[in-house]
């Protein structure tokens, strides 16, 4: 549909504005820490400048596509959120903390590959079931995992795609994710999303991202969510 196509384009249109400011709360990536540093360095972006540029990008994109647009970025202690707060269903982005919780409970990594790389719903449900079997309540276990790292979500107890997880809370967790020992495998596979699942920020080679989209029946609008590290 037209709304779905616009969702793809909308995500891509924010890439240039965001790429320079995406940072992690942790130290360097183990895969790149041995790469020689450049001889010159640039000062860290000023938060006010970042907010101004994000405000401009969000406003421009929202007007162009007649859509609600929101962005949040975080470096752990510092978080900036502009535009829509992202109060609707989070869709498949919630598979990221579900996969982490499931791995902590002994889930098979092959299920994580399918659930994250291909966004396979059956694999994600198997991970969810693993957490429920070990913890008794999968929704509470995922909520507690997020809260341990300063993030909050209301996890739907049956249809987890309908969970709500604000953009600001997603950004906070995304900044912490590389620091979580149990999340190491999830962090790796986020870099290997299959081509037909790559949209918007997930097309950037130096990033890791998980997207989710669907029809928000409450508003009768298609929504696109993307957590990007």
Describe the role of every protein-language-model region.
Residues 3-12:
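Bacterial N-terminal signal peptides that target proteins for export
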Residues 14-20:
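Hydrophobic alpha-helical targeting segments used for export or membrane insertion
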Residues 22-25:
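C-terminal motif of bacterial Sec signal peptides marking the signal peptidase cleavage site
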Residues 27-29:
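Bacterial signal peptide processing site
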Residues 31-38, 45-71, 76-78, 132-227:
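Penicillin-recognizing serine hydrolase domain
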Residues 74-79, 111-134:
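Acidic helix-start/capping segments at beta-turn-to-alpha-helix junctions
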Residues 87-107, 115:
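Active-site SXXK
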Residues 100-107, 129, 172-179:
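Short glycine/serine- and small hydrophobic-enriched flexible loop segments
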């Amino acid at each position: 549909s037209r709304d779905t196509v616009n969702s793809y384009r909308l995500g891509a249109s924010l890439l240039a504005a965001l790429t320079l400011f995406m940072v992690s709360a942790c130290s360097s990536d183990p895969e790149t820490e041995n790469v020689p540093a450049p001889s010159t360095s640039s000062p860290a972006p000023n938060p006010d400048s970042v907010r101004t540029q994000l405000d401009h990008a969000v406003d421009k994109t929202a007007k162009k596509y007649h859509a609600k647009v929101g962005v949040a970025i975080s470096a752990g202690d510092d978080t900036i959120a502009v535009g829509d707060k992202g109060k609707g269903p989070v869709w498949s982005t919630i598979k990221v903390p579900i996969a982490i919780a499931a791995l902590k409970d002994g889930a098979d990594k092959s299920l994580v590959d399918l659930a994250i790389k291909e966004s396979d719903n059956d694999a994600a449900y198997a991970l969810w079931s693993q957490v429920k079997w070990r913890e008794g309540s999968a929704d509470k276990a995922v909520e507690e995992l997020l809260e341990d790292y300063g993030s909050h979500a209301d996890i739907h107890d049956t249809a987890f795609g309908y969970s709500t997880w604000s953009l600001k809370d997603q950004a906070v967790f995304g900044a912490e994710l590389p620091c979580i020992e149990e999340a190491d495998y999830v962090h790796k596979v986020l870099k290997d999303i299959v081509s037909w699942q790559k949209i918007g920020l997930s097309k950037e080679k130096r990033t890791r991202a998980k997207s989710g989209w669907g029809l928000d029946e409450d508003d009768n609008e298609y929504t696109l969510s993307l957590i990007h590290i």
